[in-house]
Curated annotation (Swiss-Prot):
It comes from the Bacteria. Residues 1-10 have a biased composition (Basic and acidic residues). InterPro entries: PBP1b_TM. It holds the Pfam family PBP1_TM. This is Uncharacterized protein in pulS 3'region. Residues 31-43 have a biased composition (Acidic residues). It comes from Klebsiella pneumoniae. Residues 1-60 are annotated as: Disordered. Residues 11-27, 48-60 have a biased composition (Basic residues).
Length: 142
């Protein structure tokens, strides 16, 4: 096995492809051309370049979508703020309304009731009325 007489696996006698050369594409510059010749079209203006650069503006269609989304966002923000003001007014009217209309009462008179005390039903009703207790049809809490 002296020498280089071995073939790589998979080629089966075909020669290998030549390596691809890198294609260089460079931007055409105006300095590369000689514009010293005379022609009859001197009054024509050169066409502006349309290149995709990093510092250029985005296309018009993308800018239109961006402005549309900004406008929709502003409208949504205004609507949400208006709804928040409406809910705030509704909650404040409910808190300031019927919930807090009951007067606060201080029950400062202490009455000691004991099991062996002789007190009639009329006296107990008068005592409860004097301390501003209300009569209810059913108990809601113990």
């Amino acid at each position: 096995m002296a020498g280089d007489d071995r073939e790589p696996i998979g080629r089966k006698g075909r020669p290998s492809r030549p390596a691809k050369q890198k294609v260089t594409r460079r931007r055409v510059r105006e300095e590369d051309y000689d514009d010293d010749y005379d022609d009859d079209y001197e009054d024509e203006k050169p066409m502006p370049r349309k290149g995709k650069g990093k510092g250029g503006k985005p296309p018009r269609r993308k800018r239109a979508w961006l402005w549309l989304l900004i406008k929709i966002g502003v409208v949504c923000a205004v609507l949400i703020a208006a709804y928040g003001v409406y809910l705030d007014q509704k909650i404040r009217s409910r808190i300031d309304g019927k919930v807090w209309d009951l007067p606060a009462a201080v029950y400062g008179r202490m009455v000691n009731l004991e099991p062996d005390m002789q007190i009639s039903k009329n006296e107990m009703v008068r005592l409860l009325n004097a301390t501003q207790y209300r009569q209810v049809s059913a108990m809601t809490r113990p």
